């Protein structure tokens, strides 16, 4: 997968392509529907699949105090795009220059690429102040011999699948429902930190991850059925998110995972913990 991080570098990609456009901050089923539609069209016409998105949430510039917690780290997002078969990722910083482009100026810059089709969700907007919409894209497509595919929003019964809805589910600990909307288990990745190592003393060695709750979505305090991935292997386990009430003097919130059928040393190693179901709230053991 080729990654371009600047509008000024778009000219370096010269192959015919189909572009899916969106914030794609959660890569949930709605986002996958847009990208999947673009992929299908690209395959049918022998063209490359391109995705245009932002490396930072637009609100980080417009209203920093309202920036939502992330559902994916940049590394996770790139891995997901690659797994979906994206050939070209346009991962563009949302900065003042981009925010001030009119819809027409944005499309003019995008027009450097040789695309035959644009694919968006029905609520897509772009350009300064979000002035560009489906009508804008329709007029552009008609005037530039380009196909426009507009995908309807994807719903779970009466609920529209959205990153906001998924954030609420994760915050409430409803990771099973979030898993359905995402089309995958919600996961956290990080380096195992060295804790007090008391788990070893009571016969249940654990891996600990410090949580940056201000930056990435963290499930509510409780115990979860999880799967743990590292070194190309997968293990089942039980994860506890909370303030470690068993050891009352420990105040920092962490994810503590008991990995079944594993007794190795994971300190300083990178692991990914996928959440499948909330078992119960956090309980202090006497």
What do the predicted segments below correspond to?
Residues 2-9:
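Short acidic-hydrophobic, aromatic-tinged amphipathic segments that line or gate anion-handling sites
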Residues 100-205:
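Classical nucleotidyltransferase
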Residues 73-90:
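A glycine-rich helix N-cap at a beta->alpha junction
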Residues 69-77, 99-107:
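Glycine-rich, highly charged phosphate/nucleotide-binding loops
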Residues 10-73:
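N-terminal catalytic cores of NTP/NDP-binding nucleotidyl/phosphoryl-transfer enzymes
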Residues 28, 81, 118, 178, ...:
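Residue-level signal for inorganic ion chemistry
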Residues 144, 195-286:
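Phosphate/ribose-recognition catalytic cores of enzymes acting on nucleotide-derived substrates
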């Amino acid at each position: 997968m080729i990654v371009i991080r600047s509008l000024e570098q778009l000219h370096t990609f010269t192959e015919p392509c189909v572009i899916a456009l969106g914030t794609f901050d959660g890569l949930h089923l709605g986002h996958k529907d847009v990208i999947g539609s673009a992929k299908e069209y690209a395959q049918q016409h022998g063209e490359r699949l391109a995705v245009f998105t932002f490396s930072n949430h637009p609100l980080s510039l417009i209203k920093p105090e309202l920036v939502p917690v992330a559902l994916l780290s940049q590394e996770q997002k790139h891995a997901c795009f690659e797994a979906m078969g994206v050939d070209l990722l346009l991962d563009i910083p949302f900065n003042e220059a981009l925010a001030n482009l009119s819809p027409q100026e944005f499309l003019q810059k995008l027009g450097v690429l040789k695309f035959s089709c644009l694919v968006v969700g029905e609520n897509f907007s772009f350009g300064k102040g979000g002035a560009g919409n489906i009508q804008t894209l329709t007029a552009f497509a008609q005037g530039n011999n380009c196909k426009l595919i507009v995908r309807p929003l994807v719903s779970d019964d009466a609920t529209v699948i959205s990153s906001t809805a998924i954030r609420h589910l994760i915050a409430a600990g409803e990771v099973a429902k979030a898993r359905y909307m995402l089309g995958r288990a919600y996961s956290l990745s990080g380096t195992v930190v060295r804790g007090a190592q008391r788990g070893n003393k009571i016969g249940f060695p654990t891996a600990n991850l410090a949580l940056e709750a201000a930056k990435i979505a963290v499930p509510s305090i409780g115990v979860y059925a999880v799967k743990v991935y590292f070194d190309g292997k997968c293990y089942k386990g039980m994860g506890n998110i909370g303030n470690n009430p068993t050891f009352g003097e420990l105040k920092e919130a962490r994810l503590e995972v008991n990995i079944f059928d594993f007794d190795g040393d994971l300190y300083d190693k990178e692991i990914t913990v996928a959440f499948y179901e909330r078992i119960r709230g956090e309980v202090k053991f006497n």
